[in-house]
Amino acid sequence: MLFRSILIDASTNEIKLMANDMELGIETRVEGEIAERGVIALDAKIFSEIVRKLPDSDVTIETDASFKTVISCEKAKFNIVGKSGDDFSYLPYIEKNDAIVISQFTLKEVIRQTIFSIADNDNNKLMTGELFEINENELKVVSLDGHRISIRNIELKNNYENKKVVVPGKTLQEISKIVPGGVDDDVLIYLTDNHIVFEFDTTTVVSRLIEGEYFRIDQMLSSAYETKVIVNKKELLDCIDRATLLVKEGDKKPIIMNITDESMELKINSFIGSMNEDIDIEKEGKDILIGFNPKFFIDALRVIDEENVSLYMVNPKAPCFIKDDEGKFIYLILPVNFNNAAN
């Protein structure tokens, strides 16, 4: 659970639920009847688990002067201890100007298609977030972890002032969980020097940004290539997925691609066994023998919605690019040494 406490604020004519850890804050308004106004802070994990397992019916929450709380729904009744909301940190006031408008579906998809390649440790804080770069009517979202780069380019409905911010990965993961994802419903995004604000339906999310200048990746995005391969995405994904059956978690065994005219042979060797499989391809340019971390390829292929994908390679020590002709997405994956695994 991300938050320790949830504040239920029924001190006015509406019911608001809030959670805030000083880095990320969420506030949502819910419909209901207020019999007596008040505020209570409840343990976030316990409260959310109770609500999740209650019947799909109206919930009644009652508290007394000592913050003992009764949560009831149909025949179920829970008694838990709350606390005063006096020390609760409300969401900070953010001056909001020039909202960036994007559909809920698009935002959710962009996060899904990039979040897997952020770093999962804090050794480099910038790698734990994603770059949101506004350039007139385009939004570029970038994530990287030192071994791969994911880029999604989105065309916006309007032009905006150019701006770059780094949004924490945990913020985007939470957004992805709570945004309904409707195609016809929008999210309003506000950017300041220190915060990003997401507004959708009856919910507001405020997050601190990660400080620092994001990595300059343009020099890595060369369009030159020696080998281009067009392959059915599902066939390639399924083949690599099968190969990983022979790799224990934690093993660093590469998937080796031997690309020749009209055929890609994929093979893997591990202590468990070996596997090889041929896939039909369209090839342009030179033959190449190259190895990759199979998980990195699987992660990228799983979020691509195209029937066929294009792979661009230069040599066995240079990155592979998976990208479309329209420039909507680019996935860069660094190769690995496979000398010990090729036999």
What residue ranges belong to the model's regions?
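Structural preference for solvent-exposed beta-strand-turn elements
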Residues: M1-N343
